[in-house]
């Protein structure tokens, strides 16, 4: 994520090299209050055996932050109800909790549709891992702290064709310009 520009109620994110949860969260830390606030909030989430590292990084001549979560052995495969329980039991604000739960519910509904299973049978692989829970929770924590701006993702440099996204069970291809507005 490069050239994130925050204008009061709108956050513009130029994703010329792509975006991932850890990249988005690192950029929010970089343009906002920093990592100590976030670390204090993470202590409110009942997850164990993980460590967060925020460090300066430079790639392709562009300075930024890197956000890494390392976790010991643990639950990499969780059901939606497991994640809802973790978030519900956290000490995060009700607003942040509901948005995190909404995001995971949307992910579960998408997985259920792809696999033809009921939502309560969906088990997350990648997004059930500790790092994904922390990435999503961290983004919502920081966005709340920033006053819930509208987030506009775009790529000023390229018009993409045949973008491919892959996960453990699925892959998607889509075409068009890379511009999306995100309301959570």
Give residue ranges: language-model regions.
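Extreme N-terminal starter segment of soluble prokaryotic enzymes
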Residues: 5-11
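Conserved phosphate/anionic-ligand binding catalytic regions in large, soluble enzymes, centered on
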Residues: 13-25, 124-147
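Acidic, glycine-rich active-site loops and adjacent beta-strand->loop/helix elements
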Residues: 17, 45-46, 128-130, 155-162
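Short acidic, glycine/serine/threonine-rich loops at helix termini
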Residues: 24, 64-66, 163-169
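Glycine-rich nucleotide/cofactor/substrate-binding loop typically near the N-terminus or early
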Residues: 30-115, 174-184
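Mobile "lid/hinge" segments at catalytic clefts and subdomain interfaces of large enzymes
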Residues: 35-36, 148-184
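Flexible, glycine/proline-enriched loop segments at strand-loop-helix junctions
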Residues: 89-98, 123-130, 161-168
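Alpha-helical transmembrane cores and adjacent cytosolic helix/loop segments
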Residues: 109-126, 130
């Amino acid at each position: 994520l490069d050239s994130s520009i925050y204008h009061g109620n709108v956050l513009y994110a130029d994703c010329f090299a792509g975006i991932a949860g850890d990249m988005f969260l690192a950029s929010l830390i970089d343009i906002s209050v920093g990592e100590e606030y976030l670390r204090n909030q993470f202590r409110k989430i009942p997850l164990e055996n993980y460590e967060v590292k925020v460090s300066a990084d430079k790639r392709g001549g562009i300075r930024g932050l890197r956000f890494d979560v390392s976790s010991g052995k643990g639950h990499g495969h969780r059901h939606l109800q497991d994640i809802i329980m973790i978030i519900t039991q956290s000490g995060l604000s009700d607003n942040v909790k509901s948005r995190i739960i909404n995001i995971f519910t949307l992910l579960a509904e998408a997985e259920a549709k792809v696999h033809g299973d009921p939502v309560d049978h969906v088990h997350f692989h990648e997004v059930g891992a500790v790092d994904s829970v922390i990435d999503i929770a961290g983004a919502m924590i920081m966005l709340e702290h920033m006053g819930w701006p509208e987030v506009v993702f775009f790529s000023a440099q390229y018009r993409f064709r045949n973008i491919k996204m892959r996960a453990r069970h699925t892959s998607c291809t889509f075409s068009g310009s890379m511009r999306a507005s995100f309301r959570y």
